From Swiss-Prot:
Species of the source: Wigglesworthia glossinidia brevipalpis
Maturation and modification: One or more lysine residues are methylated.
Subunit structure: Part of the ribosomal stalk of the 50S ribosomal subunit. Interacts with L10 and the large rRNA to form the base of the stalk. L10 forms an elongated spine to which L12 dimers bind in a sequential fashion forming a multimeric L10(L12)X complex.
InterPro entries to which the protein is assigned, alphabetical: Ribosomal_uL11, Ribosomal_uL11_bac-typ, Ribosomal_uL11_C, Ribosomal_uL11_C_sf, Ribosomal_uL11_CS, Ribosomal_uL11_N, Ribosomal_uL11_N_sf
Family: Belongs to the universal ribosomal protein uL11 family.
Protein name (Swiss-Prot/TrEMBL): Large ribosomal subunit protein uL11
Encoding gene (name): rplK
Length: 142
């Protein structure tokens, strides 16, 4: 018999850096999850990833207070900032460009993001990434 899901909790946590402090502690504590157990599991699963990488995680909390979780690939904006070597996006992306990114780099990012975007072609993922890049104030080079 399958367990009944009580709630889903979506968080974004730096790889290998989960600890019981906010925002993790309060979000999981409300659901009655063993926070320390989650932190140990998450850190073990993400210990091979660079420590500054934000990892989206979806935690399924069951009625018996157990949990399971899946990790996703880092956000597109994280990959774009890394590729363009910038700290943050432009405050006025339409008029103020803060960097450039090549189509080659966009295709590399699309390949990294493809496991999370099931049912999408590499071309459509690339178009989505180009839209994100433009909204951050990056110009696209051929």
């Amino acid at each position: 018999m399958t367990k009944k899901i009580k709630a889903y909790v979506k968080l974004q946590i730096k790889a290998g850096s989960a600890n019981p402090s906010p925002p993790i502690g309060p979000a999981l504590g409300q659901q009655g999850v063993n926070i320390i157990e989650f932190c140990k599991s998450f850190n073990a699963k993400t210990n091979k990833i660079d420590k500054d990488t934000p990892i989206p995680v979806i935690i399924s909390v069951y009625n018996d207070r157990t949990f399971s979780f899946i990790t996703k690939t880092p956000p597109t904006a994280f990959f774009l900032k890394q590729a363009a070597n910038i700290k943050s996006g432009s405050d006025n992306p339409k008029n103020k460009k803060i960097g450039k990114i090549s189509i080659f780099k966009i295709n590399e990012i699309a390949k990294k993001k493809s496991p999370d975007m099931t049912g999408s072609t590499l071309n459509s993922i690339s178009k989505s990434i180009i839209g994100t890049a433009k909204s951050m104030g990056l110009s696209i080079e051929d």
